[in-house]
């Protein structure tokens, strides 16, 4: 019997090219710490069926070859059918005393073994089988986000775990006391990784005040701080404090919605703690603490370096500090007002559209209030061919100058190596924009066309080399099915529009049958790209970003991997602003190419033109825009 072949997808960003982390069925939160014996220790929530079913549990695995192979899973709670879920780990640094640690007079001599690993997780200790919604009208049988917050530890680099589990006590907040059980039963979970600051350990917790609409109906974030976890060998003597001060956790900005959850923390070079978390407001929320988590700045929506609000649905959005002192931020680059006001957003619609995954690069900057992080324009880092597949709950691992991301789409967990030149280009470009240094050199790799030629005028018509195909026949299988190539095309042009009229054709290679592409004005400062291979047509309209009479640098990317059309104007990625949920759009997975007539027609409004047989990364577009502005200024 022949087994159907699966076409190879060469694009490293595609999920299928990751290394699988073994799980039972459901897979969540594949988080990694590097142990002192050099292994990767991964904790993952798994189970026999869908998310939240009885028997859901945490396992750990070890890899000594960057996720190519894994040890047999070790369950934290062997044989326990009570839900134990949503684990995060913290490794005790090898140094016996951390900088900033001052021993208390009642602290006994001795330290935990070097490299001890703690794992924190939810445990349904009381075996609660059913709860009621906040309005009392609904019976809820999913019970994996309540009970006790507990930990175990390993002194053998994650090969085994302590037999005993230990409760982490936390203070009741206003939302706990106001829940349907008056705080006698608390709802919570955690996805945020622990961190260390001034000799103390901090563990995130997401409190849930109301269960019901959208499952979690009201939520906020707190920190559980231990001033002796890193130095106390006896887990029974570990002390805990709930932060922030008072009884209200990290919430949305004034006027925001009731959802503030999945908090992710970074410690800046001056000791500032920066937190980012999800909402149903269409934007990620951030807040900073400059006193070790006791008080926090008024929450605000996260912005790019130029002040534009970032957009994000109700999904995990995590930030990490890298070994070079810079940062990376995982988000999904859509949302805004349109999403916030969409029917069904609070009922669960906000959970959708976690594909593709975008990264923003961060660099610390000085502000009057202290250090903050400036964030770059976005880049696609991972995707799956089916837009409905959701990608989330990542972790970042660095080793030997290489970068790896873990992720899950709830069925499979994987590890992916990320192109280092992508990250370095993002950081370098942002640094140049912040006047910190010279940006990366322009890469003309796979440039197919560059006009006008030196000393010549822009031609009206020019022969156009063949453009890459997005989908071809797979000759390795008998049925010659189609396969995606992952190829892309970038149109880079400098132009000045004389008016705001729609329908002005700027670039056109269409033949008499309509095959090819056309870039034209769509009115009000927007551009429209039309693609046609003779049987399949796609189009996308940009945000209205072009001003009449002003020169603009435009990059249009036709990315055949995730099948995304995007526009970058004057170095800014167009994300839809407040008028659209998505600034980028998808073209048909069945569109094979955008080739048409032999010649390309160019409008006089186009002053410079380059066409590439690949996409231009956003940071490349930004640097090219800056170079074009410099040329115009010199002229």
Predicted regions and their residues:
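Short, aromatic/His-centered strand-loop micro-motif at the edge of beta-sheets
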Residues: 529-553
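Low-complexity, glycine/proline/serine-rich flexible segments
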Residues: 436-487
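Flexible glycan-contacting loops in extracellular carbohydrate-active proteins
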Residues: 575-606
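Short tryptophan-centered beta-strand motifs in secreted/extracellular beta-sheet-rich domains
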Residues: 493, 550-558, 565-567
